[in-house]
Amino acid sequence: MKTAVIVYSLDGNCSFVAEKIKSLLNADLVQLHTKNEKKRSKFGNFAWGGGMVTFGIKPRLKPWTFIPSAYDLIIMGVPVWAGSPAPPIKTFLSAARINGKKIALFVCHGGGMGNALKKFKALCAGNDIIAEADFKEPIKSGNAALKQIEDWAKGLGR
């Protein structure tokens, strides 16, 4: 099964998960980056991301290459910002026009996921959502996170 992992990660947690899934499933990886990505303090990131969620801003992305029709399974992962999936995924989904595909979703968070997965699924309407997962601080969680990622990814490969 040809698989793609699409990920946006600001602090590295979602990239950590995506890299593990890529390795386990021999998948292609597409890393999304905003055009104005900058190093900010933790509070600066909180304000920047929370502001985008609050005001419904879809940030511009750096160019990426992805052809949905080339894949049987598309796995997407983003951090949770203000109880929602990070806005860069909205920009991506608007442009990529993914429809009728098998989709698996994951989010990374620091302790509160809110309705992020519910909102993420709504953004992917018109697709078959086959799995979802949330990973709490996967980099800090070490072996426990690695086991959770492995178990989830293996379930996708069936």
Regions found by a protein language model. Name each.
Residues 116-125:
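Short, aromatic/basic amphipathic alpha-helical patches
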